[in-house]
Amino acid sequence: MRCVKTMRRRTEKIVEAWAKGTSGNIINPISNNQNMPNDDYFFFGILRGSGDMMKRANSYYFADHAYFKAGHDKVPAWYRVTKNAHVNSDLKDFPKDRYEKNFFRTLKPWRTTGSKIVVCPPTGAVEWYFDSHDWLETSIKTLKQHTDREIVVRDKPMNPQVKRIDGVTTIN
């Protein structure tokens, strides 16, 4: 297992913990003009060479900020980890006890009416990684074919003006 440095103090500790737990070796990012040894890799984030390496790796674990309770300074600090993918896209049936214990929020009923759909375009890094430079334009065009609701574009960070929304479209 080769654990790739992030070159950032706050996230380097995550790489170090993964390396310790897997008996992995911490390495610098391998540039595109160098061959990557056939091995398992661990990456945190897609910046500073990790994204390019992930595209070339045969087998890897990818970690990034969690969807719930994200943040390096929270106790406990939560992250998402995937195998050979940027996000987990398989729907699986799991017992709900861990969700209820750690993240519980009352889910509201699915809405089929409303006036606004929020589209959250990718950040520059995600747009680069997925080569999705036309994602926003394509998504809005597709939505307009299926709805007459107002479409609101919300860049990061969260826009407090968008309080009442009825649908959300994101890249990941």
Task: Go through the PLM ranges and name each one.
Residues 25-74:
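Extended catalytic core of nucleotide-activated donor transferases of GT-like folds
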Residues 49-53, 69-72, 125-129, 159-163:
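Short catalytic/ligand-binding loop motif for oxyanion handling, primarily in non-cytosolic enzymes
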Residues 5-6, 136-171:
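Catalytic donor nucleotide-activated moiety binding site of glycosyltransferases and closely related
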Residues 1-17, 21, 43, 114-129:
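Short hydrophobic beta-strand segments
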Residues 127-132, 154:
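A short secondary-structure junction signal
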